[in-house]
Amino acid sequence: MRAVWITTNWGLDWPSRPVKVLSDRYIQQKELCYILDELQSVGINTVFFQARIRGEVFYSSRYEPWAAVLSHGQEPGYDPLAFVIEECHKRAIECHAWLVTFPVGSNRQVKKQGRSSVVARHRSWCKQLSGEWFLDPGNPAVKDYLRALVGEVVSKYDVDGIHLDYVRYPDNAMKFPDSDSFRKWGSRSKSLFRWREDNITGIVTAIYEEVKRLKPWVKVSSSPLGRYASLEGFPAEWSCMEAVSQNPKDWLQSGRHDFIVPMMYFREENYYPFLYDWANSCPPGKVISGLGVYRLDKSEGNWPFIEIKRQIETTRKMGVGQAYFRYENLHTHTILRQWLVSCFYRYPALTPGLKNPISQIPDTPNNLRVEAQGGVSNISWSPADGAFTYVLYATNDSLDMNTGDQIVAVLPKNIHSCSLSIPYRNYAIVARDRYGTESEPVFWTGKNVEPDKYRITL
């Protein structure tokens, strides 16, 4: 996985202006298309689009108001989540709805939202800490609310994933004012800390089950803190288990998550030991390292580029994916983008798949044809039922579809032809469904070859 967070909170990555007049809507859409074009050009295959910020959303919802930064809380004239999903899929990029879970706004934000705020509508569900409002994870009604909120997104939109943010207790959690909730819904057999951990895990479980009930191919993930717990010789006071009652390893191991993206915005001894801990204690392919490319900015740490470069190199060697926080920082650091294009992401990559519960594979995209014309190879094939994307392989050597360096294109389901400026001797194509299950391949080696004569274990 090669992912980027597109942050909408405060319009940090998008939008640059709210919708006031009709032309603003088209400006917002044009900005999103520019962002996605750039991400496609550097090899990104997954977008985490921030669809819910603090009690406000970027889609049509029966539960929460339109975001002020989008359109001053009014209907903007289009649906940004539907738009970004469609544009991502045109580029064969996965779009995951990034949802902030428990924070619902500062005092100022809640006051500005007025009667439409979560706090005004459900005051008994909310707690205040240090001038910020939060849904109380210990209140059973909050679990039902978040499950319904996520269910609405999955039901209405063609998302590829649900990405949960802030699915934990707040910083300075020991001061979180939930003693009344603990007395009402807690258990004498559990400590406050264990009760809180169970609250978070229960909400994660409810969301996961709701997503899979509605659309089992939709992936469920979250961005936990970057360090699970202190390691011997490497203390980490601000960690999942020691600070915020968050147990993402358990979510993975018990089948309540499809992958996690720890926010590993650290370096040296605060990064590498914890990366190895995540990778060695979680199922293979289920950890995506969140990389803090914002740390390259002078005001955010002024890291030398070599720090991020080493982290990318290490995660690639370990088979761990990368997610970059956030788009604007990736956009402004030209050297990083150049390295992605010329070195790290020279070849397209396939996002991790899911187990297909119906054990069905897509049809084969038959009639693969390659025609050379003026130094360009024009390639075409027939549509395949069940395809969500097509994966094209090409090489001048023997085809080996078990390695990624022969992938030359990943194309959306409505595209059945493409052109390559570099000619190859051998080609193969497969259809891939929403679970990542691949069809039988079709080959071209100067003439079409029947797939069962060259069966490859994928």
Over which residues does each language-model region extend?
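Active-site-adjacent "subsite" loops/lids of carbohydrate-active enzymes
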Residues: W5-K30, E86, H96-A97, F102-K156
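Active-site clefts of carbohydrate-active enzymes
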Residues: T8, V218-E237, L275-I308
